[in-house]
């Protein structure tokens, strides 16, 4: 899980979602998981 100020898609399978008022990126590749914070 990477925590970044600005999150962006790394590949075509990355999907932005909102959880607990935070934007996250979920992907089939676990290295692409990101959280905005």
Curated annotation (Swiss-Prot):
Keyword set includes Plastid: yes
Tree of life domain: Eukaryota
Keywords attached to this entry: Chloroplast, Plastid, Ribonucleoprotein, Ribosomal protein
Any Pfam family the entry gives: Ribosomal_L36
GO cellular component, one term: ribosome
GO BP terms in the entry: translation
Ribosomal protein is among the record's keywords: yes
InterPro entries: Ribosomal_bL36, Ribosomal_bL36_sp
Places the protein is found: Plastid, Chloroplast
One term of GO molecular function: structural constituent of ribosome
Protein family membership: Belongs to the bacterial ribosomal protein bL36 family.
HAMAP family to which the protein is assigned, alphabetical: Ribosomal_bL36
Protein name as it appears in the record: Large ribosomal subunit protein bL36c
Organism (species): Pinus thunbergii (Japanese black pine)
